[in-house]
Amino acid sequence: MKQGLQLRLSQQLAMTPQLQQAIRLLQLSTLELQQELQQALESNPLLEQIDTHEEIDTRETQDSETLDTADALEQKEMPEELPLDASWDTIYTAGTPSGTSGDYIDDELPVYQGETTQTLQDYLMWQVELTPFSDTDRAIATSIVDAVDETGYLTVPLEDILESIGDEEIDIDEVEAVLKRIQRFDPVGVAAKDLRDCLLIQLSQFDKTTPWLEEARLIISDHLDLLANHDFRTLMRVTRLKEDVLKEAVNLIQSLDPRPGQSIQTGEPEYVIPDVLVRKHNGHWTVELNSDSIPRLQINQHYASMCNNARNDGDSQFIRSNLQDAKWLIKSLESRNDTLLRVSRCIVEQQQAFFEQGEEYMKPMVLADIAQAVEMHESTISRVTTQKYLHSPRGIFELKYFFSSHVNTEGGGEASSTAIRALVKKLIAAENPAKPLSDSKLTSLLSEQGIMVARRTVAKYRESLSIPPSNQRKQLV
């Protein structure tokens, strides 16, 4: 065996901490970014937040091209030094059209959030505490509430509840009596044993003079399976009800809630703050960043000026390190916002027909289309469109919403899956309720409009819209 030395030249991309920070900030949602910046403000004394209600002195800044995130991901290093007076204003105005302040309609932007985090069990137990139960009945009520699932149904037999209490002096009749009291709690119908029981409990709360009440009770008690199958012909025959009477009774039943527990929201609150604002001005669609969604940062000049006057090397190093971290963070935010604005403008430009006329006019578009237009990598587009939201006159949409697959048309063109879903929804909305359109018929109608799509694809689109099949949509006219 012969030993020797060999020289080999190769190139390798090094992921510096600064590049990692730029990538991480790019994929954060607005809420996550706010939390990240708040942590930075608390840990880095060289960073400070600009009070948007105070006048900010204009500072001279060095002229330089904005570094977009795509370049940042491809370069091995970012510049070693940044201007000492780098502030949020010098960064943010580059991405906001002149003459606009980032304010929206009435200076207010909607913040969408979920409902209360209170669980159904919490809500029921609150009512138990307010109800004049004896100690024994309260123990029974607690066991019953524990056996209720999130949809509001009882999940175990009463015999099991009785056994779990472990009191030989309590009998099944007493458990049944407490159950009936709980079933009158809000939401009405909770703790029902099955669907039939749930609906009948809700009907029992109606005034006895309510029209069609007895007919509705008859259908639920004896013919719920026929109603579930929309077999109205057989239902009219076995109940001997005329069509108009049956229709009214069915309408009353449909006003009931088959899952009463779900009216109590149990999920964590979800907030959506728009990152991008889109509006039409003088006949043109304008795109700007939401300047109110992210804290505005700048270098703390007082602490920065102490860098060269520190008492010892340790203090000097601490200030220099935090100063550089602050500069990198501001630069990374500049990169993030520039990328977000460029991509958003490109999306709006490509999908102008959607903003003008709605979902039916959505163009097929994939990540590669935008990546090519803005000269960035697809992975960058994916990061910047995930959990980023756009506010427009048509509503709030995640940027990823505007990307969809294509379907060939008869004329050799393409239609987006989003547009086809909108057409399916429109066709179903206009159908005869007594003779709803089957998936095959929908496929045929789309074909007449030049859109060639398989029946199973239509079924998939219909299901994605939470629209039941035709046999379940059938109604009495």
UniProtKB/Swiss-Prot annotation:
Q: What PROSITE patterns does the record tag this protein with? A: SIGMA54_1 (PS00717), SIGMA54_2 (PS00718), SIGMA54_3 (PS50044)
State which gene encodes it: rpoN
Protein's job = Sigma factors are initiation factors that promote the attachment of RNA polymerase to specific initiation sites and are then released. This sigma factor is responsible for the expression of enzymes involved in arginine catabolism. The open complex (sigma-54 and core RNA polymerase) serves as the receptor for the receipt of the melting signal from the remotely bound activator protein GlnG(NtrC).
Q: Which organism is it from?
A: Escherichia coli (strain K12)
Keyword Magnesium tagged: no
* Family from the record: Belongs to the sigma-54 factor family.
Q: Specify the domain of life of the species encoding this protein.
A: Bacteria
Ranges annotated as biased composition (Basic and acidic residues): 50-62
Matching InterPro entries: RNA_pol_sigma_54 (IPR000394), RNA_pol_sigma_54_core-bd (IPR007046), RNA_pol_sigma_54_DNA-bd (IPR007634), RpoN_core-bd_sf (IPR038709)
Give the UniProt entry's GO cellular component terms. cytosolic DNA-directed RNA polymerase complex; protein-DNA complex
Q: Which residues bind DNA?
A: 366-385
The segment annotated Disordered runs over 45-67
The alphabetical list of record keywords is: Arginine metabolism, DNA-binding, DNA-directed RNA polymerase, Nucleotidyltransferase, Sigma factor, Transcription, Transcription regulation, Transferase
A GO BP entry is: nitrate assimilation
One example of the protein's molecular function in GO is:
DNA-binding transcription activator activity
Q: What's the protein name?
A: RNA polymerase sigma-54 factor
Motif segment (RPON box): 454-462
